Amino acid sequence: YSLVHDIKDVFSAATKYGPEMMWSFNSNFNDMATDPHIWSDMDGWGDESADPIWVQNYPDQPRKYAYIQITNASGKTYLELGNLPGIKKYQYDTPEDFDAGRSIINIPVIRYADVLLMFAEADNMANGGPSQAGVDAINQVINRANNYVVNAADPLASLSMSKTDFDKKVIQE
């Protein structure tokens, strides 16, 4: 397994069985039980929407704008309209599927990024603080989230972090 290089490709139809997806629910709009009922026609009321507090606390980085639909086409926030922000991954469907409110993009359960973060957290707890292996694991996720450029809003983890600070960083990711 490996991370998909470009954050915008994590949820594309081309990578739904890609190197990052370890376990997912298959989505098929011909079977209503597996169609995720995307939020496009429902302004955030599909099967997957984002909690407003989570959206507000999300670091300002490329990943935020690749994953979350915060405004509608006219620029109003979904909260202003009385709705929840949408999970933007469905905008990577074909225009026909998106316009019809359906999707063939699988719903991820565990991605390789999740495993890297679980390892970093477990390693931190087992060692009483971050190790180089744990720092390297979380930094793979952070680097990809920031499109591989330094971002003061989401800095890399380091060995100098305390066990508590490193744990908070992993949980934030």
Q: Where do the model's predicted regions map?
A:
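Acidic/polar-rich alpha-helix caps and helix-coil junctions
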Residues: 1-30, 62-173
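His/Glu-based metal-binding/catalytic segments typifying zinc-dependent metallopeptidases
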Residues: 18-19, 26-54
